[in-house]
Amino acid sequence: MSVIEINHPLIEHKMTILRSVDTDTKSFRENLNEIAKLMTYEATKNLKLETTEVTTPLMKTQAYTLQDKVALVPILRAGLGMVDGILDLIPTAKVGHIGVYRNEETLEPVYYYCKLPTDIASRKVILVDPMLATGGSAVYAIDYLKEQGVTDIIFMCLVAAPDGIARLLNKHPDVPIYTAKIDQGLNENGYIYPGLGDCGDRIFGTK
């Protein structure tokens, strides 16, 4: 598939706020949700529509409604920070959760929780995690979703490292990646640089 880096002046401006070490928890959380909302516009432009008829105050006319049923799946916990912004645009989406954390020594994903809609296999899944670093968590989550019968997945993140992009495309070339920024790389601890720090900690004020 492909990697789509979404370029937009509002996203650029809000990403600068997120990157700054001086941004407080409230502002970080708000801007993260706003970026997620802006990205959703681009990431959903290929949703399928079906024709219908609507009666306006003047006459009947042809109109369109969403044919695709959407499920939003954040990778816990940082993915939760993108949920509200996306739901603002797709309020009918069902929401599942996949809990994966990264072992800080091996940098490999460790699974701890999953709860998905019962009809997940029939839905277009938007998988979200703000950071695509090594790609381990995203690959694990997509593996799991496909095991549940999901065939239509897109992955959305705010910041992606080349290593994570390469790993995800190698394992799941059918899954498009939408990101606000492609950063330089990973440091010795597996963190994206220049990045924006530990996104989960900055969302929830835990560090």
UniProtKB/Swiss-Prot annotation:
InterPro entries assigned: PRibTrfase_dom (IPR000836), PRTase-like (IPR029057), Upp_B (IPR034332), UPRTase/APRTase (IPR050054), Ura_phspho_trans (IPR005765)
Cofactor binding note of this UniProt entry: Binds 1 Mg(2+) ion per subunit. The magnesium is bound as Mg-PRPP.
Binding site residues for 5-phospho-alpha-D-ribose 1-diphosphate: R77, R102, D129, P130, M131, L132, A133, T134, G135, G136, S137, D198
GO molecular function: GTP binding; magnesium ion binding; uracil phosphoribosyltransferase activity
Cystine residue pairs: none
Record-level GO BP terms: UMP salvage; uracil salvage
UniProt cross-references to Pfam families, sorted A to Z: UPRTase (PF14681)
UniProt EC number: 2.4.2.9
Named cofactor requirement(s): Mg(2+)
Keywords from the UniProt entry: Allosteric enzyme, Glycosyltransferase, GTP-binding, Magnesium, Nucleotide-binding, Transferase
Record comment: activity regulation: Allosterically activated by GTP.
Residues holding uracil: I192, G197, D198, C199
Pathway(s) the chain acts in: Pyrimidine metabolism; UMP biosynthesis via salvage pathway; UMP from uracil: step 1/1
Reaction catalyzed: UMP + diphosphate = 5-phospho-alpha-D-ribose 1-diphosphate + uracil
Cellular component, GO, one term: cytoplasm
Broad EC category: transferase
PANTHER family, per the entry: ADENINE PHOSPHORIBOSYLTRANSFERASE, URACIL PHOSPHORIBOSYLTRANSFERASE, CHLOROPLASTIC
Similarity comment: family membership: Belongs to the UPRTase family.
Function as written in the Swiss-Prot or TrEMBL entry: Catalyzes the conversion of uracil and 5-phospho-alpha-D-ribose 1-diphosphate (PRPP) to UMP and diphosphate.
Name this polypeptide is given: Uracil phosphoribosyltransferase
Species whose genome carries this gene: Fusobacterium nucleatum subsp. nucleatum (strain ATCC 25586 / DSM 15643 / BCRC 10681 / CIP 101130 / JCM 8532 / KCTC 2640 / LMG 13131 / VPI 4355)
Lineage per the UniProt record: Bacteria, Fusobacteriati, Fusobacteriota, Fusobacteriia, Fusobacteriales
